[in-house]
Amino acid sequence: MSLIALLMAGLPLSQSAIILNRRDEQIRLNTCIEQIETDAELAYEDSLVWLATGNRPLARYCNAIALIALDELEEGAARLEALANAPDAITLTDRSLYMTQAGNAWLSAGLPEAAETAFDAALNMTQTDADLFKDRAAARLAQENWFGGMDDLASALALVPNDAEALGLRARAKLAVADLSGAEEDLERALDQDAENIELLVLRGDIREARRRQTPAP
């Protein structure tokens, strides 16, 4: 008898059914994610069928990310937020993931204020995700909240020192507030990690141009 069978044999029938159901749902979600990569419209249609069989959290998640893949960013983001706040038995890790993905969808939709609100909620659930701090920084920078963005990037760098993306974003923010020395310092650190990054090389040109304009003519 397999290990799974042995474990199942020691459980009441209802518990065995729950475990099997969760496993089946996870397989179905994995299929949904794979389907989105090749045919998001079909994945969305399948999600509606799945929703009709019980409106389970993973079915709602499949539906939301399929909508995002179909460029229905605002609707997908709203559904992810609703799922993150739902009373279902959803882990804190999953709730944070749903809010983070909602924030990124709002940001892609050109709504950085809504994105920041979603990232705030996600950060209330976890303070150890450097990428999440970078995400909120991006939302703040999109609103020209340069110093708020820099605070988040400092938090990201405290978790992952010398992260080229975080350093590049902070260099861009420092350039925006005319801290050219700080921008140059962060940029050089970023280039040490990713010397051929096109965005960083463009940023270097922008900083040099700002420095040139700042230098008095002879």
Predicted regions span which residues?
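Canonical positions in the second alpha-helix
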Residues: 47-50, 82-83, 121-122, 155-156, ...
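Helix-start (N-cap) detector for alpha-helical repeat units in TPR-like alpha-solenoids
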Residues: 25, 57-58, 91, 96, ...
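Residue-level recognition of tetratricopeptide repeat
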Residues: 32-33, 65, 104, 138, ...
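N-terminal leader/linker segments that initiate helical-solenoid repeat arrays
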Residues: 7-62, 77
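Structural signature of tandem alpha-helical TPR/SEL1-like repeats
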Residues: 39-42, 73-79, 109-118, 143-155, ...
